[in-house]
Amino acid sequence: AKNGDNIVASAHLYGGTYNQFKNVFSDMGIEVRFVDPADPQNFANATDDKTRAYYGEVLPNPSFEVFPISEVAEIGRPLGIPLIVDNTAAPVICKPFDHGAAVIIHSTTKFIGGHGTSIGGIIVDSGNFDWEAFPERQPALNTPDPSYGGAIWTEAVKPLGPIAYILKARTTILRDMGAAMSPFNAFMFIQGLETLALRMREHSSNAEKVAKYLSSHDSVERVSYPSHMDGYAKERADKYLTKGNGGLMGFEVKGGIEAGKKFINALEMVYHVANIGDSRSLAIHPGSTTHSQL
């Protein structure tokens, strides 16, 4: 996307992502239209000829209502609009490519790294999206790129398959924006991948037990965990989360925001820090930290 374009995104996002979309992208002239993913048709309703992508988080923090991946992907593909999903919170337990997502992103700092030791992120192109089919929808990939000798990315990669997006991201965007991972961080993430499946299994098992306990606690107003939801939220969790429900949950204690702060400050065994997917048990109060600016 560039100045004058727009992205339609789920309104259920991590606070840092929402802030970037709402403010940083706005300063760049890119409009992000936030919609309620409860009804996938909201994505279609917010789309126009300048829409370049749909975006959502598989397990958004802190609502943890699973994103309707296939429903939104099916709206976008006939229009030439790729679905980009953040699967940071659900590696292994959800496979968005199986449900039509075109691109997956991860903050590798979280579950992939697994120990809170390194900062990084990855973009994964499915190779199943036809970036050439709607050239007017993806002009950056279908017109000469002056920053790379006039290359037309969809033409340049034809012998390799439909990888125009990821090749441009790797060749020019990474070059120009500078988000280069250090070799040592990459090594740490590769190590983390070796035990990722095992850790996600245990994260899910432990979280399920905690959610069950909290659901019956007198001081808890509500628990947000995929297996403990009702209606469409539970249906989507059952559809998309095939190997556990993840290691994250949200819950509300009775007494409002001040009671939440008091609870967090009283924790002794559980760490009060923001990083998820760590080797430690963590808790945070979103209203006064990660989502305080929303």
Task: Put a short name on every predicted segment.
Residues 1-216:
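Conserved PLP-enzyme active-site core in the AAT-like
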Residues 200, 215, 219-294:
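Conserved C-terminal alpha-helix-loop-beta "cap" of PLP-dependent enzymes
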